[in-house]
Amino acid sequence: MSKIIGIDLGTTNSCVYVMEGKDPKCVTNAEGGRTTPSIVGFTDKERLVGEIAKRQAVTNPEKTVFAIKRLMGRQASSPEVKKWADHCPYPIVDGKGGDAWVEIEGKKYSPSEVSAIILQQLKKDAETYLGETVSEAVITVPAYFNDSQRQATKDAGRIAGLEVKRIINEPTAASLAYGFDKKANEKIAVFDLGGGTFDISILEVGDNVVEVRATNGDTFLGGEDFDNAVIQYLVEEFKRENGIDLSADRMALQRLKEAGEKAKKELSTAMETEVNLPFITADQNGPKHLMVKISRAKLEKLVEDLVERTKVPCQKALKDAGLTAADIDEVILVGGMTRMPLVQQKVQEFFGKEPNRSVNPDEVVAMGASIQGGILAGDVKDVLLLDVTPLSLGIETMGGVFTNLIERNTTIPTRKSQVFTTAADNQPSVSIHVLQGERPMAADNMTLGRFELTGLPAAPRGVPQIEVTFDIDANGIVNVSAKDMGTGKEQSIQITASSGLSEEDIEKMVKDAESHAEDDKKKQALIEARNQADSLIYTTEKSLREVGENVDAALKSDIEAKIEDLKKVQDSDDPETIKQATDALAQASHKLAEQLYAQQNAGAEGAEGPEGAANAGAAGADDDVVDADFTEVKDEKK
């Protein structure tokens, strides 16, 4: 049975862990890194993922996609997406059903498809690390992700060739890693501020039970917003000094993004840093350089409002859990942004205690996901995980009212039923409008889906009894059914990402991903064939230079001809043609080696006469040697 890997599919970076025996281990990537940048670069010939994609972003900004997680399950018309599009060098367009997709060279990609490219790379790294095929995974999502965003994540896994055994909330995964093997009962708060999202979860951990009491958050608050605040400041400073607006220059913005992120990280340990970008742009007077000093105090002023936005979700989560800040035993910091001193200071002020820094904020979520994978595989026993649904679920009733069936922070899996009736006489059908959210009016909440229960018998309004049942599985994914109690007629719907990918879309993307994986294998085979050819040409030419005059002229001519043949096809795109020419040269080289070996042996035999005579003389000399007796004398003085 193959291992179930744990994947933290992050906005900025992704990480993979796997259980080895009873211990979770980090899967390093091809570059030896413990995390992989969640970036995909599209070039004319290939798709690049991770660090290699990040390195080419400055010269290829419009075809390098980062922070795709921010678009998962979102409509292109939403205020969050419109705001994000203002900062994005890559184009965001209307996709299927109005979803936010990206467009690269005229082709549209869904966020699930781009995420699948990242997941494929993580899967490949895990297979290299384990030495076996990987087909199953536990993938984490922000706790405050709605149903559409969870479905989009699950679709991404499927497109990448992974069976997603469980979708688990990031703070829950972190607490699972923190509470693993802990016996003492503790009430903990997991403060998770990552690259794109913020979550706060209140949990009870101890005696191998991890129970989520409440969760809250903001799915559009994270490190990317902090970076954008720094970028905006740099743009304004440059405009003030030079009168040039860099915000329309995509290549300059990409350089500013890299420099802004670097400055932000440096100011977590230093009090001041300098952003120095030579040749950022040019005008009629020549090139322009950007040199701006930023102090930690300045950075904190720029992002203070962003840090303040974490406060209200914390208050709501505590209230829903029925606790106060004083009741919390430990505050666990998760996500790269929690390294920022201002964030740590605000957390300490809110909870009234020093935050716990015992876990690695970049890896703890993936670690927890791998433990969940171990639980599902049966490798980790006696650990019970009780998670919750982050948002209330219900249906629209008469007057456009949102009628709540499942309250937020209800432990999942769960099932709830409620009986409704018709609003008009002789109503032949009812429309079930499924919603998720906290607002009293249906129009203000998020639509998850709609379906019809038809064939109702003619009856006065208020007589038919229609039972609506909500069923949420352990992944937080919703199924809804409606049943006419009189006739027994039933209609159900599994909620898929609203306006999201159909089964046909996913199948097409799976095939596309598989074909790209096949292309990658072919490309690797081509590179290996070219490298092998290059190496053989070098060694054969070197051998000919060193011993060419001692080689049979016909053989030398044959080898030189085969070297030329291989050079002609070395840069072709057909690995089989290169291999055939390589094999032909290899056979000729073997003949060269055989001839040289034969010459060396012949030389050795010719030298044996005189050498043998010398040895015989030495043996004769031994006849004159007289053996003498001797006595061993031991020195007894110490």
From Swiss-Prot:
Transmembrane segments: none annotated. GO terms for molecular function: ATP binding; ATP-dependent protein folding chaperone; unfolded protein binding. Residues 598-620 have a biased composition (Low complexity). Keywords: ATP-binding, Chaperone, Nucleotide-binding, Phosphoprotein, Stress response. Residues 621-630 have a biased composition (Acidic residues). Induction: By stress conditions e.g. heat shock. Belongs to the heat shock protein 70 family. NCBIfam families: PRK00290.1 (NF001413), PRK05183.1 (NF003520), prok_dnaK (TIGR02350). This is Chaperone protein DnaK. The lineage of its organism: Bacteria, Pseudomonadati, Thermodesulfobacteriota, Desulfovibrionia, Desulfovibrionales.
